[in-house]
Design a protein with these regions (language model features):
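FAD-site-proximal beta/loop scaffold in flavoenzymes
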Residues: 170-187, 270-350
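Glycine-rich dinucleotide-binding loop and its adjacent helix/turn
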Residues: 54, 153-214, 292-294, 298-313
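Beta1/beta-strand and adjacent pyrophosphate-binding region of the FAD-binding site
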Residues: 7-20, 185-195
Length: 475
């Protein structure tokens, strides 16, 4: 046990480990309540979302959409010489992305400075209980210098990291962390994994001009989403030109003489690719935290175990975000950070303490077409054992009547038959995430199908389909 005032360099009310969305939000809110707060981060501020996740992914998704838009413009009368067709400047895209990420890194750093949070650059590890009921944290800077600190409360918000390939030659594969900054654009890309990250990357890089093959060991991609939506989006991806191989996996990866990768699949195929992206899931980032020193328990998947108040089994130590494995979404980590700050240091004057509510959390998948979803899937609703009604519509968006694109849209409502409440809303099509965000408010307020029906739609839009669905597809 280290004694404060001897080997410890400083003490705080709250010590946050991790400068991602959840950690920064908790630190800022706590500091605004008058707490003495420190935050340790060994890399760039902003965490996965800002640096190698949500933000660069969405920027590249925008970029991918332009190639399709250029082609569709011909259907609306736009003409240009074929020789002058737009070409992707990969270096320019990377540079623009890097500039925006650097700006956001600065924004996060500025938020900490303005709030009076002490930012410590380096890797943090737990030291265990200290005198006076405090917890100890050691920070090792890049130059090897170490400092020790104590805090009444310690928050672990270190997020997650991509799972690496474990097949022979797996070291030749890359993860989503490296995907946005490849030295050269991969003209041939093999994506391993059919989750949302794999499907997003396959769609994005296909849109940017790559020849993409997606390999997934399951029967259908996007496990966990509504089955009908999964089938629909997989079909749309294949129609666009992404090759999707299900019930198939990688046996080994070899290096070719020209720098290419030779990938042997379990079905006997050999695929040559310029890059092999492994997107087979993410795992909690707890390496080097020295959790055992503070008796912080983890589950079988390595996620830190917490109760409904984000408390670990170790007194004074809390965890939020991807490292606890509840819902790996940036807005969830932000909400958890605010709820914890209220819990530990009280809410803002005149405001009630925030409470976490994990019901009806909307989410999106930025495939082409994108997905927006909130509430129960049809499968979840049926498994609950209550009678339901399913409303759906699949159609060709107005834009594509002239564009010549074969892209279609799907909208779907799940309704509890007894209460008439809309318990699930799903969409795949243009602007699906933007549309779903608004309807998520309605579901959170307990909107009924009758209330949807009584709402006049905006015409002509895709969103109006949700308030004009009348025919029950299944019950």
């Amino acid at each position: 046990m280290t004694r404060p005032g001897s080997l410890l360099d400083s003490s705080f009310d709250l010590f946050v480990i991790g400068g991602g969305s959840g950690g920064v939000r908790a630190a800022r809110m706590a500091a605004q309540r008058g707490a003495r707060v420190a935050l340790a981060e060994g890399s760039r501020m902003g965490g996965t979302c800002v640096n190698v996740g949500c933000i660069p992914k969405k920027l590249y998704s925008y970029a991918a959409g332009y190639a399709e838009a250029f082609e569709e413009a011909r259907g609306f009368g736009w003409r240009w010489p074929q020789a002058a067709a737009p070409q992707l400047d990969w270096a320019a895209l990377k540079s623009a992305r890097a500039q925006e990420i650097a700006r956001l890194n600065g924004v996060y750093e500025g938020l900490m400075t303005q709030a009076g949070v002490a930012v410590l650059r380096g890797q943090a590890r737990l030291l265990g209980p200290q005198a006076g009921g405090l917890q100890g944290v050691q920070v090792r800077a890049a130059d090897g210098r170490q400092t020790a600190h104590a805090a009444r409360h310690v928050l672990i918000a270190t997020g997650g990291m991509p799972r690496r390939a474990s097949v022979p030659g797996g070291e030749l594969a890359i993860t989503s962390d490296e995907m946005f900054d490849l030295p050269a654009f991969p003209r041939r890309l093999l994506v391993v994994g059919g989750g949302y990250i794999g499907c997003e990357m396959a769609s994005i890089f296909h849109g940017l001009g790559a020849d993409v093959t997606l390999v997934y060991r399951g029967e259908q991609v996007l496990r966990g989403f509504d089955d009908e939506v999964r089938t629909f989006v997989a079909g749309q991806m294949q129609q666009a030109g992404v090759r999707v191989l299900t019930r198939c996996d990688v046996r080994r990866i070899s290096a070719g003489a020209d720098g290419a990768r030779q990938v042997a699949l379990t079905d006997g195929q050999i695929i040559t690719a310029d890059a092999v992206l492994y997107a087979t899931g993410r795992e909690p980032n707890t390496r080097g935290l020295n959790l055992a020193a503070a008796s912080v328990a983890v589950d079988a998947g390595g996620h830190i175990e917490v109760d409904e108040h984000f408390a670990t089994r170790a007194p004074g130590i809390y965890a939020i975000g991807d490292v606890v494995g509840r819902m790996a979404l940036t807005p969830v980590a932000l909400a958890e950070g605010m709820a914890l700050a209220d819990q530990l240091f009280g809410p803002a004057p005149g405001q009630p303490a925030r409470q976490m509510n994990y019901r009806n959390i909307p989410t999106a998948v930025f495939t082409h077409p994108p997905i927006g979803t909130v509430g129960l899937t049809e499968e979840q609703a049926r498994a609950a054992g209550r009678p339901i009604r399913v409303y759906r519509s699949e159609f060709r968006p107005l834009r594509h009547t002239l564009s010549g694109s074969g892209e279609r849209a799907l909208v779907k409502l799940i309704v509890d038959d007894a209460s008439d409440r809309v318990t699930g809303l799903h969409m795949a099509g243009p602007d699906a995430p933007e549309i779903t965000q608004g309807f998520a408010v309605a579901l959170q307020c307990g909107a009924t199908k009758a209330q949807f029906d009584a709402t006049i739609g905006i015409h002509p839009t895709l969103a109006e389909e949700f308030v004009t669905l009348r025919q029950v597809a299944r019950n």
